[in-house]
Amino acid sequence: AYEIRLSLVGSEMSIRDRDIERLGCKVWGLELFGRRSNQTLRIYIDKNEGISVEDCEKVSKHVSKVLDTENDFSENYMLEVSSPGLDRKFFYNEQYKDYLNEPLKVTFFDSQNKKTIQGRLEEVDKSSIKLEMKEGPMQIAFSSIIQANLII
């Protein structure tokens, strides 16, 4: 189990994975964006059987309660809870290993250039992924990945 801590409009909150697991789901990832006075917290949840509207509603109610009661948020915020979708974005290195041999789109820094490539996920180790492409294999360090998504 892990704990995710983030700063939202000047206050700190934590979302414990075990709390979401008690609701039958796991946290796939978090995004925080928007202006300071009107931020959006997007939480992606997942489970083996797929996510239902009811799952999103349960998690949303739980997280809203945490935001509204355990923290003093004086600014407006919007909470979104959803499935990561078929073209899911990867948030954590551990997520890649379940998608071996699947096609990925990866945006990363190569030296000082930003590149986007597509290939089949061939290998995952502690520090990188290996994609098989038409031009041959390419190893990409996790530290250089900006964003990676499944291709549907």
Predicted ranges, named:
Residues A1-G10, S14-I15:
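Single conserved hydrophobic/aromatic residue that forms the stacking wall/gate
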